[in-house]
């Protein structure tokens, strides 16, 4: 009965721990109690910090069953270390299940039951845990886990790599029709209306005209002709027209101002030249300017014109009157003599 219970425990341990392999050594073990192993051994260890200086007790329970054909041993050890005088005692529990044809080391533990518990920190060796299992990839496009059907050959990795964020996974080439399609909220009603209309036409077996392309050719040509900025964006034509008109108005104003300035400069130059001439005349004149006009026919008589240094409206009128007399006179030409 006891043998059957041990076999059940042994099989349960084999089924629950298929990928863990650890070894525990407690202090010095006599060499005569160690034999060659002929099978695989699986063990599990759970360690919690043990504090030195406390009373420690060790319990060991071992069972042995020998068969007539070969010597087989199945051992189960239960070790408990307890500390007294503390509300939260630290414990160290280790249990192992060994199968196959091997000789247990209970003699060493029986001879020195407290040899390993005298030190606060026993020598425990842990083999690296290895587990092979597949996991799902996280796809940012879906915002969740990608189904396993899209990944027929899921790779295996160590448990240390589980916490690592996987890279981007490409979406499947063929998506099912049941997948949701996200559209703009403002376009939803129009899209549904067009779909219903298309479904009605298909049910009536009516010819459906070819769907228009997204961008008409004329719009494409117009877009090519439109002016673009440095970044490739379209420029506003209204603003361009306003800016061009403003620039033209500014140019006209500048031209007008330039013409006015030129006129002023020309007038100032002319006035300066006239003043210079008048100064020269005044310096060379000894008396008054006398102008006499004589007519050979003596029809109009002698007329004398006196001009001052500066032309006046009266002198101009007299000059014009003399010219008119010359034009209407029927005799000889008038002779003007000016004494300076």
Swiss-Prot record:
Swiss-Prot/TrEMBL keywords: Activator, DNA-binding, Nucleus, Transcription, Transcription regulation
Record keyword Cell membrane present: no
Coiled-coil region: none
Cellular compartments per GO CC: CCAAT-binding factor complex
DNA-binding region in chain numbering: 212-237
Pfam families reported in the protein's UniProt record: CBFB_NFYA
Tissue-specificity statement: Ubiquitous.
Subcellular location(s) of the protein: Nucleus
Keyword check for Cell division: no
Low complexity compositional bias, start-end: 60-77
Region (Disordered): 43-116
Biased composition (Polar residues): 78-103
Major site of localization recorded for this protein: nucleus
Renumbered ranges of motif Subunit association domain (SAD): 182-205
GO molecular function: DNA binding; DNA-binding transcription factor activity
Family: Belongs to the NFYA/HAP2 subunit family.
Subunit-structure text: Heterotrimeric transcription factor composed of three components, NF-YA, NF-YB and NF-YC. NF-YB and NF-YC must interact and dimerize for NF-YA association and DNA binding.
Record function comment: Stimulates the transcription of various genes by recognizing and binding to a CCAAT motif in promoters.
Protein name: Nuclear transcription factor Y subunit A-3
Species assigned in the record: Arabidopsis thaliana (Mouse-ear cress)
């Amino acid at each position: 009965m006891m043998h059957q219970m041990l076999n059940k425990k042994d099989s349960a341990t084999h089924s629950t721990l298929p990928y863990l392999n650890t070894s525990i050594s407690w202090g010095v073990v006599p060499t005569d109690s160690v034999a060659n192993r002929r099978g695989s051994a699986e063990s599990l260890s759970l360690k919690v910090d043990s504090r030195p200086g406390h009373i420690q007790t060790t319990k060991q329970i071992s069972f042995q069953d020998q068969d007539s054909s070969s010597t087989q041993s199945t051992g189960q050890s239960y070790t408990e270390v307890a500390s007294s005088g503390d509300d939260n005692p630290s414990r160290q529990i280790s249990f192992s299940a060994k199968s196959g044809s091997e000789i247990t080391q209970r003699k060493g533990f029986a001879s020195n039951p407290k040899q390993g518990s005298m030190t606060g920190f026993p020598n425990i060796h842990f083999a690296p845990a290895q587990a092979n299992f597949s996991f799902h990839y996280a796809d940012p496009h879906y915002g969740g886990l990608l189904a396993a059907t899209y990944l027929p050959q899921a790779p295996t990795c160590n448990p240390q790599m589980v916490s690592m964020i996987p890279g981007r996974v490409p979406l499947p080439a063929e998506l099912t029709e049941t997948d949701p399609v996200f559209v703009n909220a403002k376009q939803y009603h129009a899209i549904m209306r067009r779909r219903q209309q298309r479904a009605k036409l298909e049910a009536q077996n009516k010819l459906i005209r070819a769907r228009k392309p997204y961008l008409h050719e004329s719009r494409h040509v117009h877009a090519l002709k439109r002016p673009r900025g440095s970044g490739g964006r379209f420029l506003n034509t209204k603003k361009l027209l306003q800016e061009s008109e403003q620039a033209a108005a500014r140019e006209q104003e500048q031209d007008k101002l330039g013409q006015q300035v030129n006129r002023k400069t020309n007038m100032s130059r002319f006035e300066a030249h006239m003043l210079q001439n008048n100064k020269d005349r005044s310096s060379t004149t000894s008396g008054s300017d006398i102008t006499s006009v004589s007519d050979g026919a003596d029809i109009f008589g002698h007329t004398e014109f006196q001009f001052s240094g500066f032309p006046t409206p009266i002198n101009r009128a007299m000059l014009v009157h003399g010219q008119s007399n010359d034009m209407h006179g029927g005799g000889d030409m008038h002779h003007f003599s000016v004494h300076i």
